A protein has these predicted regions:
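Membrane-interface aromatic/basic loop that binds lipid-linked glycans or pyrophosphate carriers
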Residues: 41, 208-213
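Nucleotide-sugar donor-binding/catalytic module of glycosyltransferases
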Residues: 1-203
């Protein structure tokens, strides 16, 4: 089984699109589950998610854990042996889970599989096809759950650059393959965490300190 984990913090205006793309997968419904981790949002996220409680496993956290903590929480609640992360402001092509699951099942030496992605604007209009090997992101990658536990999950001391920190650890001894089909949609908008320059700068120093070698 595949566990698709959507993490959301104050993305009520986007999370419904993410959920709809998850529900619309070509993979059989019996082969995957959807978990939404609401990281103590203060907007209308709870109200939006209340419409999907029969189709989606919703977890409304009482304390904000940050992206790393919310993803780790989702991993611990997941029933599947394969894990995929979807940020609440992004969405996915309907064949993402089917393609990645088939690839991992037929290539047992691989620990994870990614795909290329499209950058889209706030309205969802495609801007650019991105090669995920050249410009990697953590979302839209299907991991074996055992791999995530072996590599040590996300470091919850990181409130930014957590994906880079995890990537440094996994590239040292694990195998990941990229499929050159753009099956993930990465939305660019003004409130993206990656645009918080102060947080990114602070955690760049933390990243360098942890991985001096």
């Amino acid at each position: 089984m595949v566990s698709l984990i959507i993490t959301s913090y104050n993305y009520a205006q986007y999370v419904e699109r993410a959920i709809r793309s998850a529900l619309d997968q070509s993979l059989s419904k019996s082969e995957y589950e959807i978990l939404v981790i609401n990281d103590c949002s203060t907007d209308r996220t709870v109200d939006v998610l209340s419409n999907y409680t029969e189709e989606v496993r919703v977890f409304n956290l009482e304390k904000n854990l940050g992206l790393s903590g919310a993803r780790n929480y989702g991993i611990q609640k997941a029933k599947g042996q394969f894990i995929v992360f979807l940020d609440a402001d992004d969405y996915i092509h309907r064949d993402l889970l089917k393609v990645q699951k088939l690839f991992l099942e037929e290539n047992t030496s691989l620990d994870a599989v990614s795909t290329d992605y499209y950058l889209v604007n706030e309205k969802g209009v495609r801007q650019r096809h991105v090669n995920a090997e050249e410009e990697p992101i953590a979302c839209g990658i299907m991991f074996r759950k055992d791999f995530l536990y072996n590599v040590g999950l996300y470091d919850e001391t990181f409130r930014a650059r957590e994906e880079e920190e995890l990537r440094i650890r996994w590239t040292k001894k694990y195998n990941i393959h990229n499929v050159i089909i753009p099956l993930y949609r990465y939305r660019m908008h003004d409130s993206n965490l990656t645009k918080n320059e102060d947080a990114m700068s602070k955690h760049q120093d933390l990243l360098q300190s942890k991985h001096k070698e």
